[in-house]
A protein has these predicted regions:
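Conserved cytochrome P450 K-helix E-x-x-R motif and the immediately C-terminal K′/meander segment
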Residues: 67-74, 255, 259, 357-403
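Cytochrome P450
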Residues: 2-38, 79-87, 147-158, 168-193, ...
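Conserved cytochrome P450 catalytic core segment spanning the I/J/K helices
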Residues: 144, 188, 248-321, 349-362, ...
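Conserved cytochrome P450 K-helix/beta-meander segment immediately N-terminal to the heme-binding cysteine loop
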Residues: 413-443
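Cytochrome P450 catalytic-domain helical core, especially the substrate-recognition surface
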Residues: 32, 64-67, 84-85, 93, ...
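N-terminal membrane-proximal hinge/A-helix region immediately C-terminal to the signal-anchor transmembrane segment
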Residues: 2-134, 155-166, 249, 391, ...
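Cytochrome P450 heme-binding "Cys pocket" and the immediately downstream C-terminal segment
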Residues: 332-334, 411, 465-503
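Central I-helix of cytochrome P450 enzymes
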Residues: 187, 191, 249, 253-257, ...
Length: 515
């Protein structure tokens, strides 16, 4: 199990191993120099942190944890650029400090905002201060309304049924399916309908919808390259390489989205002139909430706020569901436990059709599915949607473990690494075990959000957490109620790709058998 769990780490690109002809002494020398610089930076950072007078006075003393990483070594510092350092941590106390205790001193910062601006704009995930507070207030209200909850549940069920139909056709012909692609399209269709009030139909093969979805995904990947390329601004100025491609993808996204916003704004203007009924999608709600007294609509603001929600919802749920099915295939007994729980909670009967089953899949039934909730949470522990989360320090600070932080420094906490730390989760931290989330009565028990950080914590905790769980539970319940899933080939190696979110690399080929 541990070998499988570490496989993703072992597949990082390498050169010169085992007599590979690509080996070069010059390359080895460069690699050695980089390693030496990294080690020296780490050593000096630790020495400096432990030597600061104020830091030493505030330094916490931790007892050793058997079988785990000593807490004193769960935070380290590396030199990023001249005058700026990055601090990385897996310490829940530090996470709590930056996300809640000293929240005003940490945020996205100008560096992240500048890198993400072309796609995220001034949306909620790329801004701080009053802009963030305003959007948070509007979005928080909408995500708690009964109308949106009912509307989104209907959309989730409709798209889960469409996905089940696609799976049924493949199962009847004994064909394997790429579930990563299917889930990406199904969840994109769902969130797009909820956000914009229009069916994208990528699961059915709509040309325009798929073109938008492809451009949308590509733009996210090209944005990530900016973190790795210090010369991205020059490339953007010259309109070459990845920046040229990113510009093309953003153009496709913007043309599609602005057309929808203008059409919806005109529709609402005409509708409100006749009656006071409102639509349930987020775009309509935001238009009504942000339109000025003079009737002016800020299309750019609406584009940013709604696209940010689409980005968060689509990537988190599709990726998590893909990892969930992968782990369920590795642990067939988990599938059967979920099936038994779903059947008991819905009480739909063995012969129920998909429509009859969806009718029985009420909020009350979903709330009874503690084991399914635990299995999804265990998936997020091992494969969080965002594997590395960064903040920028706005004022000099000292962390609870004694590290000094200067204004402008980056502070990173690592959900992926934290989910695999033995000092946090025990000796079986690498194992997929949903039972760790259940009490002796089989009832789901939540962990501290500063230990289980998949949804952030503090004032910026994910407002769509319940929304995401509801979508994942509906999709998972429908799929496992009607099908048994297996990996196409047990030897298929599944690892992650480098991106803003922790998605499965390449495809996830599964076979399905109707129950």
């Amino acid at each position: 199990m541990q070998q499988q769990a570490y496989r993703a780490h072992d597949e990082l690109p390498y050169m010169g191993m085992d007599g590979d002809s690509s080996y070069s002494p010059a390359l080895a020398a460069v690699a050695g120099a980089v390693a030496l610089v990294a080690f020296c930076s780490y050593y000096l950072a630790v020495t400096r942190a432990t030597g600061d007078g104020e830091a030493r006075r505030r330094r916490r003393r931790h007892p050793p944890v058997v079988g785990g990483v000593p807490p004193a070594h769960t935070t380290f510092r590396l030199l990023a650029t001249p005058g700026r350092r990055n601090i990385y941590t897996c310490d829940p106390a530090v996470v709590e400090h930056i996300l809640r205790t000293n929240f005003p001193s940490y945020g996205k910062g100008p560096l992240n905002s500048e890198i993400l601006n072309d796609l995220f704009g001034e949306g909620i995930f790329a801004v701080d201060g009053e802009k963030w507070k305003t959007q948070r207030k509007i979005a928080s209200y909408d995500f708690t309304t009964r109308a949106l909850r009912d509307f989104s549940s209907d959309v989730f069920k409709r798209n889960a049924a469409k996905l089940a139909g696609v799976v049924s056709n493949h199962a009847a012909s004994n064909q394997s399916m790429d579930f990563k692609g299917l889930l990406t399209r199904a969840t994109m269709d769902s969130i797009f309908t909820i956000a914009f009030g229009q069916d994208l139909n990528t699961l059915d093969g709509s040309g325009e919808g798929r073109r938008f979805a492809k451009a949308f995904d590509d733009a996210g990947e090209y944005l990530l390259l900016r973190y790795l390329n210090p010369f991205w601004k020059l490339a953007r100025l010259l309109n070459v390489g990845a920046e040229a491609t990113l510009k093309e993808r953003i153009k496709v996204v913007d043309e599609f989205v602005y057309k929808l916003i203008r059409a919806r704004s005109d529709e609402l203007s005409n509708t409100m002139a006749q009656d006071h009924r409102s639509r349930d999608d987020l775009l309509s709600r935001f238009i009504q909430a942000t339109t000025s007294d003079s009737g002016t609509v800020d299309y750019k603001y609406l584009r940013d706020i709604v696209l940010n929600i689409v980005i968060a919802a689509k990537d988190s749920t599709s990726g998590s569901l893909a990892w969930f099915l992968y782990m369920a295939c590795k642990r067939p007994e988990v599938q059967e436990k979920i099936f038994d729980e779903v059947m008991e909670a819905t009480n739909a009967g063995d012969s129920a059709s998909i429509d009859e089953f969806l009718t029985s899949l009420t909020d009350q039934a979903l709330n009874k599915m503690h084991y399914l909730h635990a299995a999804l949470t265990e998936t997020l522990r091992l494969y969080p949607s965002v594997p590395l989360e960064n903040k920028q320090c706005f004022s000099d600070d000292v962390l609870p473990n004694g590290f000094s932080v200067s204004k402008g420094d980056g502070v990173f906490y690592m959900p992926y690494a934290m989910g695999r730390m033995e000092f946090l989760w025990g000796k079986d931290a690498e194992a997929f075990r949903p039972e760790r989330w259940l009490d002796e009565h089989g009832v789901f028990q939540q962990e501290s959000p500063f230990k289980f950080t998949a949804f952030q914590a503090g004032p910026r905790i994910c407002i769509g957490k319940d929304f995401a769980y509801r979508q994942m539970k509906i999709f998972a319940a429908v799929l496992i109620r009607f099908f048994v899933f297996k990996l196409r080939d047990k030897k298929d190696n599944v690892s992650y790709r480098t991106a803003i979110t922790l998605a499965i690399d390449q495809d996830l080929h599964l076979t399905a058998t109707a129950r």
